[in-house]
A protein has these predicted regions:
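Hydrophobic/aromatic beta-strand elements that line small-molecule binding cavities or substrate pockets
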Residues: 15, 53-54, 68-73, 85-88, ...
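A short hydrophobic beta-strand element
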Residues: 64, 77-88
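Short, cysteine-centered beta-strand-loop-beta hairpins and adjacent loop/turn segments enriched
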Residues: 61, 89-98
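Short beta-strand edge/turn micro-motifs at domain boundaries
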Residues: 98-126
């Protein structure tokens, strides 16, 4: 793994740890302001809403206790793609599920480092 790929993997791990800790101040710098998501709830394409995330985490209706498995990254100039599995529990809208999810992230490199531009999470059935 190259140093650049390792930096993206580390960004994913640090951002996920902040999310799991409910630390939005540590999580949000990793999120591009125009991020889109296909989330773990199986819903339609959604734009990121930082205020909704903060409110959901404060209320306990949005939370996760997940860990990465098989996380890897590929770099294409100022764009990176990371893929891996998240294993554990995820609560969205008060509905808690345990399992394994496939996650693909498109990252953009900017002045502040790597930020998530698009995230696709889906349940792994295999």
């Amino acid at each position: 793994m190259s140093d650049e790929e390792a930096a993206v993997v580390e960004a994913a791990q640090v951002a996920t740890a902040a999310y799991c800790a409910g630390d939005t101040d540590a999580f949000l710098p990793y999120i591009h302001p125009e991020r889109t998501t296909f989330g773990p709830d199986g819903g339609r394409l959604a734009s990121f809403d930082a205020a909704a995330l903060r409110a959901g985490m404060a209320a306990g209706s949005v939370q996760a206790q997940v860990e990465w498995e098989g996380l890897q990254a590929t770099i294409h100039d100022n764009v990176a793609v990371s893929t891996g599995y998240l294993v554990g529990t995820w609560t969205i809208g008060g509905d808690t599920r345990e399992g394994r999810w496939r996650e693909t992230i498109v990252w953009l490199r900017g002045g502040g480092g790597w930020q998530v531009s698009h995230l696709h999470v889906s349940e792994c059935l295999a």
